[in-house]
């Protein structure tokens, strides 16, 4: 069962399992927004019994109907603190209105960076999964929260994966994030 819901005045994609387990994941997408692939990820998690709520960073815009250039421009307009506040409202909704007992966060690329930041900010999280978090060597102008300072504060178990052929995030950055987790 999937639907678009409103939380705090913003849209989010909800995928519910046929047989709920009380577990949930907040899914933070890559630059694609809540496109087809993200909806598929959410459905796969729901099929395993995990209620999945996907944050919509671009408020309805996705690569389903927009070019990469548009998505890059929108990504550069994201404000870290505003995004983190939106994610915390989604977590509140998951624990409150959805009645979930355990919630983790999983993010890809853009969402991987935010998964680490949110993990440092919200102790309610059961786990943090960050697939190839986009943390450039030189922070983007709109990156006002430093993941190197925040990552050591994560209390939940963390799984972070780095793609071997990444051309955006140097291996040294990944190693520094990894050191912060140790």
Residues covered by each model-derived region:
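N-terminal cap/leader regions of alpha/beta-hydrolase-fold enzymes
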Residues: 1-182
